Amino acid sequence: MSLPAQGRARVVIEHLSPQIDAGRFPVKRSVGDHFTVEVDAFTDGHEQIHCLLQFRRPAETEWHEVTMRALGNDRWRAGFALERLGDYAYRALAWVDPFKTWRHDLQRREDAADIELALEVGARIVEAAAEAARGAQAAWLRQRAAGLRGGKPLDARREQALDTELLEAMLTLASREWASQSATLGVVVDPVRARYSTWYELFPRSAGPAGRHGTFRDVIARLPYVAELGFDVLYLPPIHPIGRINRKGANNRLRADAADVGSPWAIGSDEGGHKAIHPALGGPEDFRALVRTAEEDYGIAIALDIAFQCAPDHPYVREHPQWFRHRPDGSVQYAENPPKKYQDIYPFDFECDDWPALWQELKSVFEHWIAQGVRIFRVDNPHTKPFPFWEWVIGELKAQHPELIFLSEAFTRPKVMARLAKLGFTQSYTYFTWRNTAWELSEYLETLTGSQLAEYFRPNFWPNTPDILHEYLQRGGRPAFAIRLVLAATLSANYGIYGPAFELLEREPREADSEEYLDSEKYQLRAWDLERDDSLRHLIARINRIRRQHPALQRNDSLRFHAVDNPELLCFSKHDPNGGDLVLMVVNLDPFHRQSGWVELPLDEFRLDPHVPYAVDDLLGGGHYLWHGARNFVQLDPQSLAGHVFLIRSNLRTEQDFPNF
């Protein structure tokens, strides 16, 4: 075994965190976050070490530095503010520090002779540092070295030696010749909407009056409604020309009538492909007007669906037949998921010989819509395309546009969903739709927020989608919709609904044991009465207003579940890490019956005095209560209130602190 290149680098650096797969992938944060890093750092013997956190942006050549604080058991911590979008690199640096070691030793000495000798040693260390310094700093250090040797009583010189000003000066001049360095890791900083967003999905073609194909101008007219509900992302299914060959009819009939409009996901016709707009929706200027009006007038970002698949009459099929697989009879292989067949859709062959050109063309689809002002993309079925493609295309696009957000619509196996998030997808759909009991929800959320997944996987909860009408909604009626809304909006900082189907309680399946909607908008135009008395619009607006007003609900990292003696009740809390509000949720999971129980809260964790009452204000239901101690009673009737969203207030001093005063 050969000698090490640097045998005098004695500090061991281990377990730098956070990190994903030994640094293969970056962790994720949002702009404005304070990024905290920890590391194990230690050396042989009893000498003192100095540990730094270094960070920089890709364009920077010099590292910024923060001194790490010892936590005990050789664990160190420091952090820095993430002030800009894009990538940051970070690493730890540590070395055995002679001055810190000497200073620590001096603090323990009591014998005068020992102290006098130690001060001489310290003076020589400071003099050596002065040789490396320049100008006024060098002169100041020589003066401090002389002061350690004499002229003042021993106690005064010892106090001077332990002065923090001297320590800081010595640390800035410390030799790093024998420093140990960790691997360099990365963190990608996304927009705040990556962490906290509220999505509303609608079909533009159903935004017009009954009997007429909707347009982008109709969607512009719908923006006040979407804003009133409190959404800040408006997601549109594909807006491209729809294929005519093998077009599906209403309710997914294999044969379409002349009046059938087809599925927006069967992209492409003689009128154009992925960079074209369906003529009935309007033109490019109409689309740009929608993007501009939504953002400038209502603070709503337009999210566009990207589905990399083609209808049989898509121009790509004619112009680039090599991008598709062909069957022995020469026909193009359509999409299949046996026993299901999708004759109206051709998937790309990512293993074709012309794959570099295919990749570049698909990248250009994103670039086209970015040029039209789109910054958020919902990507359809990314798990059916190669992982290397997504890592490349998202990396290329975000290098130029770090503000981009990509939502992965991959309802697939957990490891596949996690890999897509590691590769660059900003948010992901989840299994929330199929988690309905208290145990299912708590177990799933603890996995999402309490494991390493939380470093890179941002969940986006959807109670419904155009493809998924869960049995819980089908059978539970209006209370079930309210329950799932409250759960999605409070468990996850990112959530969305497919409307107006959701707020208008659309719940009739196409057939028994199906999650498909009857008369689904995927295959036909629908006219919606937004003014219906039974609409959930007011509840939706209220829960979204609560989310905006309480930062605790804009993050997932503080989510905690709490004991309750009734399995039909789910109790959980979130708090603002910046010392702000504490919000407690109790939700009735039973859409049919009134449920009650005793919830038990961790008073120490909440910093509540067990002997002092505290107020709980129901932000959703409007009630105000005075609770005592850890155990308190709740009762919820799903016909009137799906759940409580309590703001907990302590430190009540006078009767005027109570809302009902």
Question: Where in the sequence are the language-model features?
Answer:
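Generic recognition of short, well-ordered alpha-helical segments
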Residues: 214, 247, 388-392, 596-598
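Carbohydrate-interacting/catalytic domains
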Residues: 1-206, 210-232, 241, 294, ...
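Generic enzyme active-site microenvironment
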Residues: 199, 235, 303-304, 378, ...
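Conserved beta-strand->loop/alpha-helix structural units within folded catalytic cores of enzymes
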Residues: 223-232, 236-237, 287-306, 369
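Residues immediately flanking
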Residues: 306, 410, 465, 589, ...
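Alpha-amylase-like alpha-glycosidases and glucanotransferases acting on alpha-linked glucans and related
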Residues: 261-292, 298-300, 310-538, 542, ...
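Active-site-adjacent substrate/metal-binding segments within catalytic domains
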Residues: 191-257, 262-283, 348-358
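Aromatic-lined carbohydrate-binding surfaces of glycoside hydrolases
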Residues: 238-250, 306-323
